Amino acid sequence: MLVVKADYKKYPIPVLEKMRIDEDEFYKKYEACVVVQTCNRIEAYFDTEVNSDIDCILNDFSGFDVLKGKTATFHFLRVSCGMESMILGENQILGQIKTSFQKARELKKTSRYLDGLFLKAIHVGQRARTETKINEGGVSIGSAAVELAEKNFGLTNRNVLLIGAGEMGTLVAKALLEKHIKAVIVSNRTYERAETLAEELKGIAVHFDKLKEAINFSDVIICATSSPHYILKKEDLNDVGNKIIIDIANPRDVDDAVREFENIKLYTIDDLRNISDKNIQKRVEEVPAVEKIINEEYEVLMKQIEKINIEEVLKDFNSYVEEIRVKELEKAIKLSKTKNPEEIMENFSKAFVKRITHDFVSYSINTSKEDLMNSAWWKNGK
């Protein structure tokens, strides 16, 4: 196998965006290949048994790193487990691999080898996430905010107000999607953005001038705007009942004086960083367990590939023998009018064996023992 890759470790996101592969053109040009592209990763996987012109591939992917053989296979298994992701153990990459593989299969661009490899990688990614805690705990600020709210207040059947529909608000929204929330309300100065995010969350969008009513209705408030001024001041929160407010904005959205209310618990981005850092450390501690799974499954994969190779060799050899049989049989049929059956069968069997041994000897004379053991000599002997 051959992998060409470019990712966030080497290139900034704007550069990666310019390096993205035109998948329509890619799949028109190559066979036995799969492209996996995310916002911070571009990778193409090639079955080199089919794509033998490696130089052509390398010329097309100037600037990409190149991995081959065992190194390429281990890399892909690590990618599927989230071990190569910007956020260690993240779940999204596994779904992206599945989608990319499905597209290549629908286009009939995979091979028996790539089918086995991708199915194994998906299985390994699933094992890593079910048998270890590599994907547990919020490590982004957005997911940490949701985790904090759930831990301190519980989110099941709660009403959550999200103030801000920008980048940070969207991160929170993605984390909220996994929870059994009663209702989600999204408010933003640009109402259309609130509407779009609310639709994704199957929630409700409210205009900014209706914020007071939304606060009264909510149990948990998450603030994530880019405003240079406070969105919520102390006077805005008189008589609103018990609330948890999580302020992940920078600069802050909520006046610290809000802490004076006994019925309101205010958490800031500093509290979330502590949670995020602890969760990252927990994930790092799971790395050896994931690597053990990868090593185990790699050995299983190698046995599967060896079996596939043997089956392909036997198939090719049978075709080679059948080709000789047909040719020698045609000669025997032509002789059937002038010679007796016993003589014809004798000549046929000798010619059949002689042709096979001749091809083998011709190829093996100038071939090392190691190369001979690893070769399909009958292809070269023709």
Curated annotation (Swiss-Prot):
It catalyses: (S)-4-amino-5-oxopentanoate + tRNA(Glu) + NADP(+) = L-glutamyl-tRNA(Glu) + NADPH + H(+). The record marks H75 as: Important for activity. PROSITE patterns: GLUTR (PS00747). GO terms for molecular function: glutamyl-tRNA reductase activity; NADP binding. Substrate binds at T38, C39, N40, R41, S85, E90, N91, Q92, Q96. Keywords: NADP, Oxidoreductase, Porphyrin biosynthesis. GO terms for biological process: protoporphyrinogen IX biosynthetic process from glutamate. Its EC number is 1.2.1.70. NADP(+) binds at G164, A165, G166, E167, M168, G169. Pathway: Porphyrin-containing compound metabolism; protoporphyrin-IX biosynthesis; 5-aminolevulinate from L-glutamyl-tRNA(Glu): step 1/2. The active site is at C39. InterPro entries: 4pyrrol_synth_GluRdtase, 4pyrrol_synth_GluRdtase_dimer, 4pyrrol_synth_GluRdtase_N, GluRdtase_CS, GluRdtase_dimer_dom_sf, GluRdtase_N_sf, NAD(P)-bd_dom_sf, Shikm_DH/Glu-tRNA_Rdtase. Catalyzes the NADPH-dependent reduction of glutamyl-tRNA(Glu) to glutamate 1-semialdehyde (GSA). During catalysis, the active site Cys acts as a nucleophile attacking the alpha-carbonyl group of tRNA-bound glutamate with the formation of a thioester intermediate between enzyme and glutamate, and the concomitant release of tRNA(Glu). The thioester intermediate is finally reduced by direct hydride transfer from NADPH, to form the product GSA. Homodimer. Possesses an unusual extended V-shaped dimeric structure with each monomer consisting of three distinct domains arranged along a curved 'spinal' alpha-helix. The N-terminal catalytic domain specifically recognizes the glutamate moiety of the substrate. The second domain is the NADPH-binding domain, and the third C-terminal domain is responsible for dimerization. Belongs to the glutamyl-tRNA reductase family. NCBIfam families: hemA (TIGR01035). This is Glutamyl-tRNA reductase. It comes from Methanococcus maripaludis (strain C6 / ATCC BAA-1332). The lineage of its organism: Archaea, Methanobacteriati, Methanobacteriota, Methanomada group, Methanococci. The gene is hemA.
